[in-house]
Every structure is written in C-alpha cells, then in structure tokens.
Design a protein with these regions (language model features):
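Cysteine-rich micro-motifs
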Residues: 230-250
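Extracellular/mature segments of secreted proteins
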Residues: 244-245, 255-257
Length: 322
C-alpha cells in the first residue's frame, strides 16, 4: 500500500513518499525548515495550478473510463510537474502512481479508490484557495504574535468549541491518521500518514498550537515565519534563492547600520574617513598614506568607544591628524 508520511524533528519537517508501500527506503524524502511547507502553501498561486489540476482531472477521468494510456501518461507527467511546485502535491502523484500499478494486478480499474481520487482532483481548485483563507484567519486569531499574542493554546481554546471553530472562516480540525514510531536512530515521533492535502495542513496548525509556536510577518520580505527561537525576532530565516542573504542577516546589518548612524563617534569617524578617501582621487594623498591613517583612526575610535578619550578629544585628533 502506498504511503505519504510527515513528521517534525528538531526544527525540521520531513516528508516521505512511497508508491509501492514498502516500509524501507521511501521513493522520495524531502526536508524543510519547520512549518516551511505550510507557509509556502500560503504563497502558492492557485490560479497557476488550477488549469493544471483541471487537465489532470480530465485525463484521469478518461483513463479510468476508457483505459486511455495516453491520457494516463499526460496525467502522470502533469502530476509530476505539480509535485515540483509544492511538496503537498507529491501525495497526489504517489497515490495515482500506486493505482496505476495496482489496478492491473488486481484488475479493478474504475474502483471506488479511483473514483475517490477523481473526486479529490475535481474539488481541489475550489478547496485550495479556501484552505489558504482559513489558514490566514487561523494565523490572525491564534498564531500571529502581533495580533493574537504569545499564547496559541489560550487563543485556540477561545476560538473553538470542541473541534468546531466559532468563526466560520477558521480552519476546522478533524481526526487525522497519526502513528508513533522510530523516525531516526534513538528517536521516536508522532508521524502523520496523510490521505489528503488537508491532513498535512491540519497537522501543521495543530502542531504549532501544541508547541506554543507563534508566527509573524518578516520586517524585510513580508512573509510569515515561525518563531521557533526568540519571540522578539522580527526577521525570518526562510529559504531564499542561492546567493541571496536570508532576511535575518539583512536585518542584523540594518540594525547595525542604524545603531552606527545614531552613534556620534562613528559619525565623526565616517565623515573624516570619506573626506580623506576623496583626497586619493584628487591626488592629495597616496593610497599608502590613506590606509596608514585609517588604521590609526580606527585605533583612536576604539579608545573613544571604551571611554579612554572623550568624543571632543577624538574629534580634535581627527581634525589635526596627518
């Protein structure tokens, strides 16, 4: 039997998929930072994936009804493309891949399971944006540290009656297929055996509440990020394209720059540094003389930073130094 597993481990989320269902090495294993799958799902362009889903639905329907091999090949190719857009869609690919093999062994093409897959494919274009809206509302009322506070447990209890949300726009929780098993050497964890995309969303949201993990929008990129460290963190560490800085590094530099710009010692040093650097282009000073001066200026600045000399003395030194 095929499976789609998801679990959390030490700041990571792990997905394992297998279309054959052997409990050994999975076909696919992917690791992401904690909550990344849910947050990237929130950023998914549903208008982009809707026509792909509709085409897959048409092809899967033709294959089930007519044993159209070309339709099956087209559906599987597009399912593979969807899986590369977001990890949640890998579940659809693996389930269909399993049925592709199993139906010929069991001679049951058009089974209730095939009809279930078809129903899910048909409903997803409407369900995906609805899930996004419900997750957004859950963030606002339960997890967003800036609007809901630092106690997700209390906010969840406030906004739900048993397992039903008081606000109809909130995500509604249902029983999900959870196991508990070894996931790494010497470590066990709850493991979700997903049967739908909804299961994975459900597991991510309830895990945040159980762990009292809040979310916040990054001050640099504006994306949501989980506050798994300091609750005062304002910049995220979400994945970025190769070669780019993560927002937390950018934020640290911005804070340093702001601090320096407000520092009269640094401002005095920087002003004189830029003035003398311009002398190089004007031919008033050699490179060697400038760098020798800048080395001495840094030493004097450090003295001023440590209150060995006063700001006035440092400014006088800058004015008179050669």
């Amino acid at each position: 039997m095929w499976y789609a597993k998801m679990y959390f481990s030490e700041g990571r989320e792990i997905f394992q998929y297998d279309s054959l269902g052997t409990q050994g090495v999975p076909d696919v294993q992917k690791e992401f930072p904690f909550l990344e799958s849910l947050l990237s799902f929130q950023e998914l362009d549903c208008a982009e994936v809707t026509p792909i889903l509709q085409s897959i639905t048409d092809n899967w329907s033709r294959f089930i009804a007519e044993d159209d091999k070309e339709a099956l090949a087209s559906a599987m190719k597009k399912l593979g493309g969807l899986a590369s857009i977001h990890i949640y869609f890998r579940l659809l690919y693996v389930h269909c891949r399993y049925r592709q093999s199993a139906m010929y062994i069991q001679n049951d093409r058009g089974s209730a399971e095939d009809a279930q897959i078809l129903d899910e494919l048909r409903q997803l274009p409407e369900q995906l944006p609805l899930y996004q809206q419900q997750i957004q509302r859950f963030f606002e009322l339960v997890l967003d540290v800036d609007s809901a506070g630092r106690e997700p447990q209390a906010q969840a209890a406030k906004n739900y009656f048993h397992d039903s949300p008081k606000d109809p726009d909130l995500f509604s929780f249902h029983p999900i297929p959870l196991s508990f098993e070894p996931v790494e050497p010497g470590r066990c964890s709850p493991v979700l055996y997903s049967s739908s995309i909804r299961d994975m969303i459900d597991y991510s949201l309830r895990s945040c509440v159980e762990r009292n993990i809040t979310v916040r929008r990054c001050k640099n990129c504006g994306r949501w990020f989980p506050q798994t460290g300091r609750v005062s963190a304002e910049y995220c560490e979400r994945p970025v394209p190769r070669g780019e800085q993560v927002c937390r590094e950018i934020g640290a530099f911005k804070q340093w720059t702001k601090k320096q710009s407000d520092d009269p010692i640094f401002k005095a040093y920087r002003k004189e540094y830029k003035r003398r650097f311009a002398w190089i282009k004007a031919g008033r000073i050699t490179d060697e003389a400038f760098y020798a001066w800048s080395e001495k200026a840094r030493e004097e600045k450090q003295k001023c930073d440590r209150d060995i000399i006063s700001l006035a003395e440092f400014q006088q030194w800058l004015k008179e130094s050669k």
